[in-house]
Amino acid sequence: MLTTSCPLDLLDEYIPEDKVSEDKIANGRRAVVRMRSVLGDDAFRNCKAELPVAIGRTFGNKVKVFDLAKAPHLLIAGATKQGKTVAINAVVASLLYSKHPSELKFVFLDPKGCEFSAYSRLGGHYLATLSGENPIVQTKDQAGKTLEALCEEMEARYSHLSVGSISNIVEYNKQASTPQERWPYIVTIIDEYADLTIPAGREEESRYISREITESIIRLAQKGRAVGIHIILATQRPSKKVITDSIKATFPTRIAVRTMTRTDSRVILDSPGAENLAGGGDMIFKIDTETERIQGSYISPEEINRLTTYVESQSCKKTPYTLPEPDSAPKA
């Protein structure tokens, strides 16, 4: 991690195991699964994944960990206030506890302007940004430019791979002569995807930006894995207009929190079921064709503030990561 590892006591005390076991399920809902309990579990601590994510506990009370690097992207969808943002925060916390700033950068796109403000504290440690832009992307125009810059970053990395006859980021980093030459993984988190991709009104410029954003996301999802660029896409509007066939084809790993209708569940998972979830972080996790019901890890806003404040306070050398300017030459 940083100067020292992020201590688990930044997070609230775990709930004893007997409080979250199957026989404690009441009224169709499980007890809260604290983030601290899953991050302290051997399933996460001993995981050898490149980008381990402790998403929650199964209904057999086992910690569920998956590798975002293999996922390689994640779609999170469902009705409002059913656990979508909490799932995103669990992903971020998992990665902060497992990767050094030199190994990982985040890009946050927050069109609502209220979900990711605490993560601005990650600043020069964990964020990748355009030069001179806000650390948390909030406007549609800035989102379009940032995604275009990520596409250029991706193509620049592919150019390096082709020169060295290397196939992926893991091989590239193993052959790097110095730590400074290694590439960090870049995890781009997009909250309320629909706000960025559905044009506002009939203005041609708005339609153009929406189209460019969609095309950039699909391009990154199709090619980003090999060079360490991964997308997490979230929406509370799981309609076919938002979650298109192209999006579904490039996001085989999905999380559905409770949906309003059976149809919404089918849009997310290709099957019903999410409409019957209990809410409060109760979710269905799908990877390829396999599905599993999970009680999502919960991290409170207070815990997020403590965690990001701790990262901000660390005195180790900061490693800011500046994305290439859109339409500029790829950086060396």
Label the model's feature ranges.
Residues 22-38:
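Interdomain "pre-motor" coupling segment immediately N-terminal to P-loop NTPase/helicase cores
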Residues 35, 122, 169-172, 265, ...:
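Generic structural signal of hydrophobic/aromatic residues within well-ordered alpha-helices
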Residues 1-12, 18-21, 38-167, 180-259, ...:
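P-loop NTPase catalytic phosphate-binding loop
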Residues 162-172, 323-325:
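Short catalytic/ligand-gating loop segments at beta-alpha or beta-beta junctions
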Residues 6-7, 42, 287-332:
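Conserved alpha/beta core segments of nucleic-acid transaction machinery
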Residues 31, 202-203, 316, 320:
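N-terminal helicase ATP-binding lobe
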Residues 173-178:
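Conserved helix/coil segment N-terminal to the catalytic DExD/H
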